[in-house]
UniProtKB/Swiss-Prot annotation:
Modified residues (Phosphoserine): S173, S192, S195, S431, S514
Any one annotated GO CC term: plasma membrane
Subunit structure, as described in the record: Binds AP-2 and clathrin. Interacts with ITSN1. Interacts with UBQLN2. Binds EPS15.
Key word Repeat present: yes
Protein name per the record: Epsin-2
Keywords: Cytoplasm, Endocytosis, Lipid-binding, Methylation, Phosphoprotein, Repeat, Ubl conjugation
Family: Belongs to the epsin family.
Tissue spec: Highly expressed in brain. Detected at lower levels in lung, liver, muscle and testis.
A Pfam family matched in the record: ENTH
C-alpha cells in the first residue's frame, strides 16, 4: 500500500465519508494512472439511487474545483463525469447542463510541471469535448445507447469467464486475482472442456440471475436499448442502400451522357468535312464557269529560275505568257516583263495603231479579220502586233515600262522607220516617239510619273551633247532571250537602233555652225518644251515612202515654218542621225 492510499484512507475515516464518496475519491485520486473501469461502473450503478446520486455529484464538483499540482483530480473528475453521463442516470446529464459554466471555465486551465511540460492541455481538451457533448442532445442520445450496449457486452463477457475472476478490494483500486475452485477441478479433470463448463455452470447460472433485470424500470430500459439498437442498424443499412442506389444512378446517367456526346461529335466532324469540300467545289465551279481561252500565264519564282508554274486568271480573261525572271538580272539579259491585267499593251515593233474614237466599242480588225469583233470584257484572243487596240488586253503579254521602247528597238527588224512621221496624241494608240508621255506611260507601280526628255534635264543646251557617243555596242548574246518567240523559230539578228547608219559625229565647231543649232535655239529659248497640239489625222508609216536616211536637212526658214504648223522640234533633226533623244 502506497503512502497516498494510506493518507486517503485516514481522511476517509476522519471525515466520515460514505461508501459512494469514498469510491469517487478513489476514482479521482492523484495517482499517476487513470480511474478503473470497474470502479466507474460501480459508481454509475449507484447514480440510479437518489441518495447516492447526490453524494456522488457533490464529490465530483468538489474535485473539479481543484487547481495547480492537483490537475489529476480535475482530469479524472472530467473522465468520470463523461462516463456517468453516458452510462449513468439521466439526471447526471441534466445536472451537468445546469452547471455547464463550471465545466466551461476549465477551458482556460493552466499548469506547467517542473519539467516544463504543459499538463493543463489535457484538462482543456477534455472540458471542450464534454461541453460539446452536453450541448448536442442528439449526439448524447446516440452515445448513451452505444455506451450502454458496450457495458452490457462487457458484463456478458465477464459472466462467461469462470477460470479467473477479477475482484477488487473495498479499500484499494488495484485488482486482486483469485483462483477459483473451478480451476482446480479443471486441472483434475484433465482439461476437458465439458468437465470445465460443467464445473462452472452453477456459478455462471448465478451470475446470469444477477444480470437479469430486477425491476420493471431496468427491464424497460433494456427493451428500449434493444429497440434503439435494432432501429439504428436498420437505418444504417437503409442509408447504405440508398447511397449505393444513388451512385449507381449517377454512373448510369454519366455513361448515357457520354454515349450521346460521342455520336454528336462524329456527326459534327462528318458535317464539317463535306461542307468544306462543297465550298471548295463551289468556288472551282464558279471559276470554271467563267470563259477562259488562250495560253495560261507562267509565273517564275522571283528568287530563283525554276520551272514556271501555271497561274489562273480569276477574272476568266486570257493572260498572255509572261516570263518573270530574276529581279537582279545579269548584263545582256532582257528586262523583266510583268503581267498587269489593267496595264496598257505594247507592240513588238514600232508601228502605230489606228486611232479608235470609242474605247468601249468593238475595235476595228485588220483586213484579214474584218468580219470579227472584239469584246472589251470577254476573253481576249491573241492577235498579231499589227492588229487593233484592245482596251483590257495585251498585245504581246507585257506591260510597258521605262525601258520597253529600247527593247522594241533592239528586237525590231525595221529600225527607225518612222523618224519623220508625226505621232498622234491619242491615248489609245502606240506612238513611235520615245518621249511621248501621253501614250507610252506604263501602267506600272508609278503611273503618275512623267517621262523625262533631254530638254527637261539639259535645258537649252540639249543640242550640244552628242548622246550617240555615250552609247556603246553591247556584246551580242550567245542565244536569243526573247520569251515571245515561238519554240523552234529562228531568232532575229540583234540590231542596235542607235548604231544603224550612224554618220561621223560632228565636232563642237561644226555643231556651232550647223543650221540645226539655230532652230533648236529658237525652240529651246524657254525653260521647257512647248506643248504640241494633236493633229487631226496622221498617215501610217507605210504611207511614207522615204525612210529616215532619205530625209533632207531643213534650213532655218523651214524650221520656223514647221514650228508655226505645230510640228514638234524632234521632226526637224538632221536626216543622217537616228539618235532617239534628238528625234
Amino acid at each position: 500500500m502506497t503512502t497516498s492510499s494510506i493518507r486517503r484512507q485516514m481522511k476517509n475515516i476522519v471525515n466520515s465519508y460514505s461508501e459512494a464518496e469514498i469510491k469517487v475519491r478513489e476514482a479521482t485520486s492523484n495517482d499517476p494512472w487513470g480511474p478503473s473501469s470497474s470502479l466507474m461502473t460501480e459508481i454509475a450503478d449507484l447514480t440510479y439511487n437518489v441518495v447516492r446520486f447526490s453524494e456522488i455529484m457533490s464529490m465530483v464538483w468538489k474535485r473539479l474545483n481543484d487547481h495547480g499540482k492537483n490537475w489529476r483530480h480535475v482530469y479524472k473528475a472530467l473522465t468520470l463525469l463523461d462516463y456517468l453521463i453516458k452510462t449513468g442516470s439521466e439526471r447526471v446529464a441534466q445536472q451537468c447542463r445546469e452547471n455547464i459554466f463550471a465545466i466551461q471555465t476549465l477551458k482556460d486551465f493552466q499548469y506547467i510541471d517542473r519539467d516544463g511540460k504543459d499538463q493543463g492541455i489535457n484538462v482543456r481538451e477534455k472540458s471542450k469535448q464534454l461541453v460539446a457533448l452536453l450541448k448536442d442532445e442528439e449526439r448524447l442520445k446516440v452515445e448513451r445507447v452505444q455506451a450502454l450496449k458496450t457495458k452490457e457486452r462487457m458484463a456478458q463477457v465477464a459472466t462467461g469467464v469462470g477460470s479467473n475472476q477479477i475482484t477488487f478490494g473495498r479499500g484499494s483500486s488495484q485488482p486482486n486475482l483469485s483462483i477459483s475452485h473451478s480451476e482446480q477441478e479443471y486441472g483434475k479433470a484433465g482439461g476437458s472442456p465439458a468437465s470445465y463448463h460443467g464445473s462452472t455452470s452453477p456459478r455462471v447460472s448465478s451470475e446470469l440471475e444477477q444480470a437479469r433485470p430486477q425491476t420493471s424500470g431496468e427491464e424497460e430500459l433494456q427493451l428500449q436499448l434493444a429497440l434503439a439498437m435494432s432501429r439504428e442498424v436498420a437505418e444504417q443499412e437503409e442509408r447504405l442502400r440508398r447511397g449505393d442506389d444513388l451512385r449507381l444512378q449517377m454512373a448510369l446517367e454519366e455513361s448515357r451522357r457520354d454515349t450521346v456526346k460521342v455520336p454528336k461529335k462524329k456527326e459534327v466532324k462528318a458535317c464539317c468535312k463535306p461542307g468544306s469540300h462543297s465550298q471548295q467545289t463551289t468556288l472551282l465551279d464558279l471559276m470554271d464557269a467563267l470563259p477562259s481561252s488562250g495560253p495560261v500565264a507562267q509565273k517564275t519564282e522571283p528568287w530563283s529560275t525554276g520551272t514556271p508554274a501555271n497561274q489562273t486568271n480569276p477574272w476568266g480573261g486570257t493572260v498572255a505568257p509572261a516570263n518573270i525572271s530574276d529581279p537582279w538580272p545579269s548584263f545582256g539579259t532582257k528586262p523583266a516583263a510583268s503581267v498587269d491585267p489593267w496595264g496598257v499593251p505594247t507592240t513588238a515593233s514600232i508601228q502605230s495603231v489606228p486611232k479608235n474614237s470609242d474605247p468601249w466599242a468593238a475595235s476595228q480588225q485588220p483586213a484579214s479579220d474584218a468580219g470579227k469583233t472584239a469584246d472589251a470584257w470577254g476573253a481576249a484572243k491573241p492577235s498579231p502586233a499589227s492588229g487593233s487596240f484592245e482596251l483590257f488586253s495585251n498585245f504581246n503579254g507585257t506591260v510597258k515600262d521605262d525601258f520597253s521602247e529600247f527593247d522594241n528597238l533592239r528586237t525590231s527588224k525595221k529600225p527607225a522607220e518612222s523618224g519623220a512621221s508625226v505621232p498622234p496624241q491619242d491615248s489609245r494608240t502606240t506612238s513611235p516617239d520615245l518621249f511621248e508621255s501621253q501614250s507610252l506611260t506604263s501602267a506600272s507601280s508609278k503611273p503618275s510619273s512623267a517621262r523625262k526628255t533631254p530638254e527637261s534635264f539639259l535645258g537649252p543646251n540639249a543640242a550640244l551633247v552628242n548622246l550617240d557617243s555615250l552609247v556603246t555596242k553591247p556584246a551580242p548574246p550567245a542565244q536569243s532571250l526573247n520569251p515571245f518567240l515561238a519554240p523552234g523559230a529562228a531568232a532575229p539578228a540583234p540590231v542596235n537602233p542607235f548604231q544603224v547608219n550612224q554618220p561621223q559625229p560632228l565636232t563642237l565647231n561644226q555643231l556651232r555652225g550647223s543650221p540645226v543649232l539655230g532652230s533648236s535655239a529658237s525652240f529651246g529659248s524657254g525653260p521647257g518644251v512647248e506643248t504640241v497640239a494633236p493633229m487631226p489625222s496622221v498617215a501610217p508609216h507605210s504611207a511614207l515612202g522615204a525612210t529616215g536616211s532619205s530625209l533632207t536637212p531643213l534650213g532655218p526658214t523651214a524650221m520656223n515654218m514647221v514650228g508655226s504648223m505645230g510640228i514638234p522640234p524632234s521632226a526637224a533633226q538632221p536626216a543622217g542621225t537616228t539618235n532617239p533623244f534628238l528625234l
